[in-house]
Amino acid sequence: MSSDKKQGFEASLERLEALVGELERGELPLEEALAAYEEGMKLARLCQKRLDSAEKRIEKIATPSGDEEA
């Protein structure tokens, strides 16, 4: 998972899309399909965490507060 943390959001999403494509084609042997599914679920959770974090940052920036005015 440490290599996942080093990947950027875009790279993780690109890998996830590739895995989905492989699974949708239905040509992978069972064990490879299971491994791809497992990796895909990890990437999906990682991407969701990053999106949630970005949303919180945006909300924090967009929320007016009196003590942060320039």
From Swiss-Prot:
Example of a GO cellular component annotation carried by this entry: cytosol
Subcellular location(s) per record: Cytoplasm
Catalytic activity, as annotated: Exonucleolytic cleavage in either 5'- to 3'- or 3'- to 5'-direction to yield nucleoside 5'-phosphates
Enzyme Commission code(s) on record: 3.1.11.6
HAMAP family with a match to the protein in the record: Exonuc_7_S (MF_00337)
NCBIfam families according to UniProt: PRK00977.1-4, xseB
Complexes and interactors: Heterooligomer composed of large and small subunits.
Annotated protein name in UniProt: Exodeoxyribonuclease 7 small subunit
